[in-house]
Amino acid sequence: MKQVSDASFEEDVLKADGPNXVDFWAEWCGPCRQXAPALEELATALGDKVTVAKINIDENPQTPSKYGVRGIPTLMIFKDGQVAATKIGALPKTKLFEWVEASV
């Protein structure tokens, strides 16, 4: 899973080939930590269809502000430099996989 920052977001996500699922998270967020293993599995299982990235909102406040992230965890699918889908809140693994597969 790729770690991105405010400085690398444009290059790593917006200009990337193929879709990206970006997890907006924070160290202090319990639901974020709970879902991390499912995101790791997603990155491995669907790595040929989507790149999974994480951005820590405390260390990188500009990007979540730009995309209107109000609660975490927030997952966004980016395609061709645009937000294609957004999901706020933790999802069970099966729902996460279904949502990402339907969105990419």
Swiss-Prot record:
Pfam families: Thioredoxin. It comes from the Bacteria. Keywords: Disulfide bond, Electron transport, Redox-active center, Transport. Belongs to the thioredoxin family. GO terms for biological process: cell redox homeostasis. CDD domains: TRX_family. Disulfide bonds join C29-C32. One of its GO terms (molecular function) is protein-disulfide reductase activity. One of its GO terms (cellular component) is cytosol. Participates in various redox reactions through the reversible oxidation of its active center dithiol to a disulfide and catalyzes dithiol-disulfide exchange reactions. InterPro entries: Thioredoxin, Thioredoxin-like_sf, Thioredoxin_domain. This is Thioredoxin. It comes from Rhodospirillum rubrum. Residues 2-104 form the Thioredoxin domain.
